[in-house]
Amino acid sequence: MIEAIGNQYVVARPVYSTKAFGEEFKKTYGHHKTFLDHLKGCCSCSSQKAKKIALSLFPIASWLPAYKIKEWLLSDIVSGISTGLVAVLQGLAFALLVNIPPAYGLYAAFFPVITYFFLGTSRHISVGPFPVLSMMVGVVVTRVASGSDTSPALSSSSAENDSMIEEKVMVAASVTVLSGIIQLLLGVLQIGFVVIYLSESLISGFTTAAAIHVLVSQLKFMLQLTVPAHSDPFSIFKVLESVFSQIQKTNIADLVTSVIILVVVFVVKEINQRYRSKLPVPIPIELIMTVIATGISYGCNFEQRFGVAVVGNMSLGFQPPITPSVEVFQDTIGDCFGIAIVGFAVAFSVASVYSLKYDYPIDGNQELIALGVSNIFTGAFKGFAGSTALSRSGVQESTGGKTQVAGLLSAVIVLIVIVAIGFLLQPLQKSVLAALALGNLKGMLMQFAEIGRLWKKDKYDCLIWIMTFIFAIVLGLGLGLAASVAFQLLTIVFRTQFPKCSTLANVGRSNIYKNKKNYADVYEPEGVKIFRCPSPIYFANIGFFKQKLIDAVGFNPLRILRKRNKALKKIRKLQKQGLIQVTPKGFICTSDGFKDSDEELDNNQIEELDQPINTTDLPFEIDWNADLPLNITIPKISLHSLILDFSAVSFLDISSMRGLRTILQEFIRIKVDVYIVGTDDDFIDKLARCEFFDDEVTDSIFFLTIHDAILHIWMKKDYSTSKFNSSQEKERKFDFTINTNGGLRNRECQVPVETKF
């Protein structure tokens, strides 16, 4: 019965052990499906199920028929044009990160948008080149392509021959296709949950480090220096060394141009950010600066007068599709897996933000399929891996984009550049593209502010951020990502291996139990210790759990058990020698000349001392806290009951079960009653299946709550120390109440409680 009195509540119910609760309230068991049942469900087909699968694979079929032309079309047109112009410039700029000619960036900006239009579940993200992925692909291209020597004049008109360019394009395309295959397989197998191993802190630290890599990689274009390519660990430092060793060769025209572009882009982007509520659309500063820079470069003939590196020949139209290289697959499968996971993690996180903002569902596994098909399609046409760029998606959403129709129209803009007006960009300086690429890094570089916020919120997450950043900077993006995931998992192991165990006490003279160190006014029942473990118990932390429990109770139960068994052996020995007599009233000493000795025992004798104490041959029960005859001394303990709060223990493994049973047996053998509270039924069922229980450790030690166990302990002690009338002993009904002045228990009967154990 629950009764509310003002802002308080009074509960009158029986004291339940888990076993008693199960006897009174029968569980309902649902039908357990076998593997064959699941297989039949997967293989069965109906018209409704077929329709559901079709809508799942092609989400466009669900939202396109409901498209509101009058309300959404104009917004999507404006958004599509704006996003398309940004996509063109980002495609050209991010191609430099891949170490291939800028024209191939247009393919990466076109093809994934088409496939995502049909297969994607997000209505607002813009799929295409992303600087972090471009950098990761570029690292692989640098490592795999033979004789890769990245120079600022990277185009078909440069000193680098056509075969070298084709090899780099082949490597980038093959890596993209394999990454797409991995994403497609993960989506088909419905294991998109792998992205959960990349926490927000890890992604933030990784993308920040990738932004630093992008920044360093673009220095050679901004300064027009010939910098050897590096892809091994510490490559970023080697690139910096190469840059500064030839800094005197800097092309001043490229440097001045890139600095001006960079400053203007940063300033205008800040204006867009601060006044986004007042501006109808963000100022397309990248487009404006590109048009101005192209016009000035062409009109003043920068290429001839100052020797600047320009985009160069832009062949119109598409190139024929290619067959990926199996050799590249074999050499880059690890890198491709990292590219696939990072690409999906970034895209899904951005899509999740917009889905929450506009209240529509997204499907992680379908997103994997959409991105996988997009990358396969893009790689086949000589593009490179893509995801979603935060800045480009922000443009699509902020300019009024409602659906992926805006994305389709942005692809039309890219298509026009590819087939018709791409030649107009030939005079554009590569330093301008490098500056535009860096201009899009502001958001990622600002993530350094996360360190302070994370330190205040969670030091483990802050450490993950810092170590991820260091790993990605020092080891490179591929190895850095693997090391970061390993370190993150290690922190999880560390948290569970060394949990913050605590001793609980009663707070407020009620049924609330908290860490006694955190509160001044607490009540700790005499002879009772309440110990809480806030993590799973498994093979790695069972030893730590035992030591913390020993520290909490103040003694080692195994040592006490051995001392008592050893004392019992001495008593029997003295009895045989006639030095003491054992009577029902206790021990009678017949001599006082015995000296206690603590001789060493062999292994067999130690094993005997670990067994339960057997006093059946004695006419009375030994009080181990009383003085023993003839100076036989053993440690005295006041603890009679131990409560283990397992409400936060989600699982036990086989190794920890053995260790836990040993711990419980040691306490039980020294007459300390052990109770476990807060576990669910599955936990106890697993213990039963694993043969955890025996004659000493039974399932009667489990109680629903700490307070149930406390009341049971008090009533149990009352039974053994008090005399009751026959009706009370028969029905075992006693009355307890909460006394806010003197403690939890009051002998005056006010609240009837039925005792069950």
From Swiss-Prot:
Keywords: Antiport, Cell membrane, Chloride, Glycoprotein, Membrane, Transmembrane, Transmembrane helix, Transport
Compartments in which it is found: Apical cell membrane; Membrane; Cell membrane
Catalytic activity entry: hydrogencarbonate(in) + 2 chloride(out) = hydrogencarbonate(out) + 2 chloride(in)
Glycosylation sites: 161
One Gene Ontology molecular-function label: bicarbonate transmembrane transporter activity
Motif (PDZ-binding): 754-757
Sequence intervals crossing the membrane: 72-92, 94-114, 125-145, 177-197, 202-222, 251-271, 279-299, 336-356, 368-388, 405-425, 463-483
Modification after translation: N-glycosylation is required for efficient cell surface expression, and protection from proteolytic degradation.
Cellular compartments per GO CC: apical plasma membrane; brush border membrane; membrane; plasma membrane; sperm midpiece
Pfam families named among the record's database cross-references: STAS, Sulfate_transp
Cited InterPro entries: S04_transporter_CS, SLC26A/SulP_dom, SLC26A/SulP_fam, STAS_dom, STAS_dom_sf
Topology versus the membrane: Multi-pass membrane protein
Main location: membrane
Record-annotated STAS domain positions: 518-713
PROSITE patterns reported for this sequence: SLC26A (PS01130), STAS (PS50801)
GO biological process: cellular response to cAMP; chloride transmembrane transport; intracellular pH elevation; membrane hyperpolarization; sperm capacitation; sulfate transmembrane transport
Cytoplasmic compartment residues: 1-71, 115-124, 198-201, 272-278, 357-367, 426-462
Membrane topology (Extracellular): 93, 146-176, 223-250, 300-335, 389-404, 484-757
NCBIfam families the UniProt entry points to: sulP (TIGR00815)
PANTHER family: SULFATE TRANSPORTER
Family statement drawn from the similarity comment of this UniProt entry: Belongs to the SLC26A/SulP transporter (TC 2.A.53) family.
Described function: Mediates chloride-bicarbonate exchange with a chloride bicarbonate stoichiometry of 2:1 in the intestinal epithelia. Plays a role in the chloride and bicarbonate homeostasis during sperm epididymal maturation and capacitation.
Subunit-level organization: Interacts with PDZK1, CFTR, SLC26A6 and NHERF1. Interacts (via PDZ-binding motif) with NHERF4 (via the third PDZ domain); interaction leads to decreased expression of SLC26A3 on the cell membrane resulting in its reduced exchanger activity.
UniProt name for this protein: Chloride anion exchanger
Organism name: Rattus norvegicus
